[in-house]
Amino acid sequence: MPELPEVETSRRGIEPHLVGATILHAHIRNGRLRWPVSDKIYRLSDTPVLSVQRRAKYLLLELPDGWIIIHLGMSGSLRILSEALPAEKHDHVDLVMSNGKILRYTDPRRFGAWLWTKELEGHNVLAHLGPEPLSDEFNGEYLQQKCAKKKTAIKPWLMDNKLVVGVGNIYASESLFAAGIHPDRLASSLSTEECDLLARVIKAVLLRSIEQGGTTLKDFLQSDGKPGYFAQELQVYGRKGEPCRVCGTPIVATKHAQRATFYCRHCQK
């Protein structure tokens, strides 16, 4: 599933081609996504795009009378086309722009979403979200406060959007490795120093992935059709049985709530 770096990479890639241009019309080939494509999106016509923002794993297209909320789901990606290339099987939505560009949404598993809302505040998919991990609000002090009485493993807690948004399976595993923290540790067992370190490395890992265009394991592509290159720098995720790049110990894979977790039993305590 695309996580924060992939969604932010998509935002940065599409923003220059959408802001200041006008949506001439939307072409919906298959509106049966995780939730049906909102009726308002079908009827878009001569609508300028004012901004392209991100909240958690949601892309937000600001229009004069409301917002398009896009979620990439498990396998979605957005591309900017310079011409109307023939659509393939999993190309479900096109926004045809006044500058000759086309924003094309591809989603093999159709777990994504294209929603419309008049107001962002209070929308059900955006309500109850925790802070952005790259914000000043997310720091060691905040993390320690939230972990202090939490009797659950730190790995799934990091993936809870009520704690912090956008840190999914890949970046939770990678951040815990970078901090030297075992994913099975109780959140409440983390010291002040460990919380400070973990908050810092989460930011560093996410920023590095954004620099590299995110992580492509299967479906995700950047808006120019290129893969995300952070996959080449993964330390533990997807490397079961391979030697740890630090100590040489084989990487272990376990499952937490049906999600694979990767770690080094020597480097992470």
Curated annotation (Swiss-Prot):
Q: Which GO terms describe its biological process?
A: base-excision repair
Keyword Ligase applies: no
> Where are the zinc-finger regions (FPG-type) in this chain?
235-269
Q: Which cofactor does it need?
A: Zn(2+)
Instruction: List the signal peptide residues.
Output: none
Residues of the active site = 2 (schiff-base intermediate with dna), 3 (proton donor), 57 (proton donor), 259 (proton donor)
Q: Which residues bind DNA?
A: 90, 109, 150
Q: How is the cofactor bound?
A: Binds 1 zinc ion per subunit.
Q: What is its EC number?
A: 3.2.2.23, 4.2.99.18
Keywords on record:
DNA damage, DNA repair, DNA-binding, Glycosidase, Hydrolase, Lyase, Metal-binding, Multifunctional enzyme, Zinc, Zinc-finger
Q: Which reaction does it catalyse?
A: Hydrolysis of DNA containing ring-opened 7-methylguanine residues, releasing 2,6-diamino-4-hydroxy-5-(N-methyl)formamidopyrimidine; 2'-deoxyribonucleotide-(2'-deoxyribose 5'-phosphate)-2'-deoxyribonucleotide-DNA = a 3'-end 2'-deoxyribonucleotide-(2,3-dehydro-2,3-deoxyribose 5'-phosphate)-DNA + a 5'-end 5'-phospho-2'-deoxyribonucleoside-DNA + H(+)
> GO molecular function, one example?
zinc ion binding
Query: Which family does the entry's similarity section mention?
Result: Belongs to the FPG family.
Instruction: Name the job this protein performs.
Output: Involved in base excision repair of DNA damaged by oxidation or by mutagenic agents. Acts as a DNA glycosylase that recognizes and removes damaged bases. Has a preference for oxidized purines, such as 7,8-dihydro-8-oxoguanine (8-oxoG). Has AP (apurinic/apyrimidinic) lyase activity and introduces nicks in the DNA strand. Cleaves the DNA backbone by beta-delta elimination to generate a single-strand break at the site of the removed base with both 3'- and 5'-phosphates.
**Subunit-level organization:** Monomer.
Task: Show the NCBIfam families listed in the entry.
Answer: fpg, PRK01103.1
**Protein's name according to its UniProt entry:** Formamidopyrimidine-DNA glycosylase
Q: Which organism does this sequence originate in?
A: Salmonella dublin (strain CT_02021853)
